[in-house]
């Protein structure tokens, strides 16, 4: 994922937390705030309580990969922060993807069938 698709600055994180709305399930919390750009931006937060640096980085890589795969179905004019909760470190990729897409659907950031999935015609 390119750097212009990431929330990096502390002031941006604080603005999203303060002014944005939150949605959650058992494994993830998502804060979102509309932006004036023509693309979404994502920030990631993984606590040190979830494991050592290797584990935390693996979680972040998986989250970025899930978002990259769902890129075509994500709303464009929003900044959002994904916070991983305790228990995420034990999930496999498929279960993590299911949980993350669930909370993104709750927040209406992810809209199924709105993107790069190709429709197949049956004759």
Curated annotation (Swiss-Prot):
Any single Pfam family the record assigns to this protein: Ribonuclease_P
Signal peptide: none
UniProt cross-references to InterPro entries, sorted A to Z: Ribosomal_Su5_D2-typ_SF, Ribsml_uS5_D2-typ_fold_subgr, RNase_P, RNase_P_CS
GO cellular component entries: ribonuclease P complex
Assembly and binders: Consists of a catalytic RNA component (M1 or rnpB) and a protein subunit.
HAMAP family noted in UniProt: RNase_P
Identification of the protein by name: Ribonuclease P protein component
């Amino acid at each position: 994922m390119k750097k212009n698709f990431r929330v990096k600055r502390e002031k941006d994180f604080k603005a999203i937390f303060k002014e944005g709305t939150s949605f959650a399930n058992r494994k993830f919390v998502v804060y979102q705030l509309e932006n004036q750009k023509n693309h979404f931006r994502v920030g990631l937060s993984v606590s040190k309580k979830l494991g050592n640096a290797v584990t935390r980085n693996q979680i972040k890589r998986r989250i970025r990969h899930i978002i990259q795969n769902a890129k075509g179905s994500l709303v464009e004019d929003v900044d959002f922060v994904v916070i991983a909760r305790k228990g995420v470190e034990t999930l496999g990729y498929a279960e993590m993807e299911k949980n993350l897409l669930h909370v993104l659907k709750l927040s209406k950031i992810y809209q199924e069938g709105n993107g790069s999935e190709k429709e197949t015609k049956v004759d």
